[in-house]
Amino acid sequence: MKLLLLTLTVLLLLSQLTPGGTQRCWNLYGKCRYRCSKKERVYVYCINNKMCCVKPKYQPKERWWPF
């Protein structure tokens, strides 16, 4: 019974403490954050003034247009 009460308490606390998740950007390939991880790059900025951190494989390739 004590184990059940402890488990329910922990689950209740975890459901209250965990955020809903980060806002998604760049066609759901990026995440809006204040700092990007080492494997991510900033490509655009989100509406909430955070950086849209996108992994390099999901960013468009740069094309050089001849003039």
Swiss-Prot record:
It is found in: Secreted. It comes from the Eukaryota. Abundant expression in the male reproductive tract only. Abundant expressed in testis and the caput region of epididymis, but low in the corpus region. Residues 1-20 form the signal peptide. GO terms for cellular component: extracellular region. Has antibacterial activity. Belongs to the beta-defensin family. This is Beta-defensin 123. It comes from Homo sapiens.
